[in-house]
Amino acid sequence: MFAPGIKEILVEFHETSSITATFLVSIYILGFAFGPLLVAPLSEMYGRAPLYNIGNILFTIFTVGTALSTNTGMLLAFRFLMGLAGSVPITIGSGSIADCMKMENRGKAMSAWALGPLLGPCIGPIAGGYLIKAAGWRWVFWLIVIIGGCLIPFAFFCLRETYAPVLLERKTARLRKETGNPNLRSKLASDKSAAETFKAAIYRPMKLLIFEPIITLMSLYVAITYGILYMLFTTFTFVYSGHYGFGVDTIGLAYLPTGIGMLIGVGVSGFLSDKIVKDRTAKGLIHRPEVRLLPYFTIPCGLLLCAGLFIYGWTVQEHVHWIVPMVGVLIFCAAIMGIMMSVQSYLLEAFLAHAASVTAALAVLRSLLGALLPLGALDLYESKLQFGWGNSLLGFIALLLVPIPFIFYVYGEKLRKKSRFNKAN
């Protein structure tokens, strides 16, 4: 939301580094890389609702610190802490959906849930641009504080626990108290102590990421495309102000095609994903998670993603009318959402018993590249490659990853049967 004000911040804090300019935006995503490692195990021990409420409070407090920042270091630190607290719904949101939704409705539910964290960076800069011009960049964060302060009590009273092991343990504890029988145990209770459970859970996302080839390669695909997305996000301000003369108030409109593209990708992905599951159920076929990786959808999405990068890069370099690179961005964003939603739905069902840990593993790699790849974006575009070959290079890298969903569509079930993590399903 404050991306349109980057140039204003650089002037106020006497900064000239292009790396600092992009890092001010992307460091928030770096918080998403580390937060899930703590949030995922805690959610599997204490449930989802307490973490949502604590995360909301901490996020609002850290946003106050961001608004009061007096130098670049302070601003970067509080932006990172905002990302840590903001990672709570990103990490356990899909787990809550898995807790509540039937299998045939999860695709649409996942799509609806994804709209928040993905449309935020698209719609936010539009409102932020006009707010920054009218009141300065700090009011972006004061507005977030006001909204957060209003939502905290609403969430506290309205959110209910959904995680089955925690709910069953609470019921068991109540029955122990009512019956006086200390030997009653939850069917889902673990024999491990809280410390042992936490230790096992905190290592699980990294074990999944390192030792599960399905999660490793799928996460890598999503992470690279997500990193490219944030390379575009963090450079839009410089591209559209420098090449097309957009002002502080109108620069946010450059992010609008990303939102439109994501809406298209999410809508199509959710519809097709649930439709194929319902069709298979109607035919009496056994559901397998691999059907979420529809080859006739994920492969075209992968190719369109590359095409969008080529269109954006070369039309910016040749100074074609600004609407044309925006069309390229729209195509790219529609395609990336198709891929991300298919992959996330697949991984969630393939490792359902460890949904929070799988989401954490996916978030760690995705957020690391989302935060770090943009640091070299301006240098890439200012090199001999410029926008044309620079974005073409990114497109060719993405092209190499296109077959990954198809590989696991064919061989995923065999690999899952060999997985020790999958036995809990």
Q: What residue spans do the PLM features occupy?
A:
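A six-helix transmembrane bundle that forms the core substrate pathway of small-molecule transporters
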Residues: M1-N425
